Amino acid sequence: SKAAFLSFWDLKTKETLRIDLWTKDMESDEMKHFFHQTLLSMSDTLERAIGEEKMAGDLRDFCHHFSDKLLK
């Protein structure tokens, strides 16, 4: 694997703690696709975990906009 995003929820501070890792040989196009796929998976999680269908749909719409602008 060339990249990983790891997130933890800090209940006390109500903030996300993150570790973003990627290899030096990961190309920028690969990173763009990785971001796009990560955002899409977050929309799925939003819908499945807490039933936010409309917001998940809005996030998917943004993902399509994101891909139109970034993934050419």
Language-model segment annotations:
Residues 1-6:
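Short, charged/polar N-terminal "headpieces" of proteins
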Residues 44-72:
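C-terminal charged interaction modules
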Residues 24-48:
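Charged/polar low-complexity intrinsically disordered segments, enriched in acidic residues
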Residues 8-30:
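A short, charged
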